[in-house]
Amino acid sequence: MCPDIGQSSSAEESPSSLYERLGGVYSIAPVVDDFIDRIMDDPRLNANPLVDEAHHRVSPSGFKYLVTEMVCWASGGPQTYTGRSMYDSHVHLEITEAEWGFFMEDLATTFDQFELPSSERAELVSIVESTKPDIVLAEHDERRTTS
């Protein structure tokens, strides 16, 4: 477990924002690093040739930076997300419901590895789920053939 995630010295001193309860950027970054490595290597996600190509086109360190920035911002931290919108980043990838499910399984595996407390886990899942309409944009789950 990342030492600071979900730990505080007493209920009275319990941080109010999710960002603070997660331990800030230095606790969030290793979780994001693990998750990004996991999704970039997931053969179920890379079976989508558009996702596979994107995973090989982007710099893993840049991708991790932007996702860390976004998680920090979305959880109430002082960071500002500077990347593209979720829609603009994913519209061309034709991500399916099934691929979203694999993505969420990878997220759960990362949360398990870092022993993320259930309340923080639920809040983060809610944040991630709020992005689904801008990410899952394929018209159906059958892989389209490209010429």
What does each of the following model-derived ranges do?
Residues 1-147:
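Core of compact, soluble alpha-helical bundle domains
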